[in-house]
Amino acid sequence: MDVSPLPPYLGPVSSPTEPSRTPDFLNHDRPPVPDIVVPRGVQPFHLRDKPVRGRLVRLGALADALLTRHDNDPAVTTLAGQALALTAGLAAALKFRGSFSLQAKGDGPVPMLLADCTDSGALRGYARADAEKLAPHLADGATPTAAAMLGQGYLAFTCDQGPEMERYQGLVAIEGDSLTEMTGSYFRHSEQLATHVHLACARTPSGWRAAALILERVAGAGGVGEELDEDAQDDAWRTALALAATLTDTELLDDTLPGERLLHRLFHLEGLALDRARALSYGCRCSRARLSGVLAGFGADDLDHMAEDGVITMTCEFCNLGFRFDRSDITSAEQG
């Protein structure tokens, strides 16, 4: 993996630009977090005696709860939903304690796309959009590609296991029109791992839904595919890809079609075996206490500059909740 240690990261706690919708303001410590848990949000699986493993990700109502915190154009919301599903699926394949994140940063009308998932399945994310720059891409009802929205920049996947551990990041230039193609480029260049990624996000009669199907070719050793010679492994991988290619966005996002049945439709003739499912939940972790600690790290002059009529306002970019602080209540780091 192409990795490099990163400096400490606090996360986006305050928006430097106007939020995508008017934030809801709170003065108590913890915002009301939606009690949404998807028990089988990620369904890992493998194909017996074949070099194929995968994850089916379906966010269900969790997608709507996360995506509707911001009043973005549907094209931007679709991109954000795909990022959420992809991040949940990739995180489920790792053994870690902390958070795993996807970040795309570019010079386009959506300069920042971010999603992260903890080891317990708490998921959050957002897309920061510039409506003025985006408008030309939406002319005549056009739907811009992910590449057009993000522009030139980079795609990064980061595993953060806390302040006592190094953070590792795989980073590649944005290549490809869609987030699916960008992810494929990342795995080819950084992981050198054969993958198949199908991402879907759309507004349905039940609200926004987001889902993903991820396939990975694994090494022949270790019990998966070890009984097959190289040619047979190649054939098994090609067969899995051909079957996965028959999946439609409609099927992937269909709440009435259980995930187990969907996987059975695709792979039942290939020795499908379901592994332990993973729950996903609403995962914004902002709080008044945390943001107060961030403010305390600024100098007095900076705090004075932030204040308007004696009040400092901070908005969580993930959930779009705003917090108000009296300037007189914040003691800067230089004041001790």
Which ranges hold each PLM region?
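Cys/His-clustered metal-coordination modules, chiefly Zn-binding fingers
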Residues: 241, 245-336
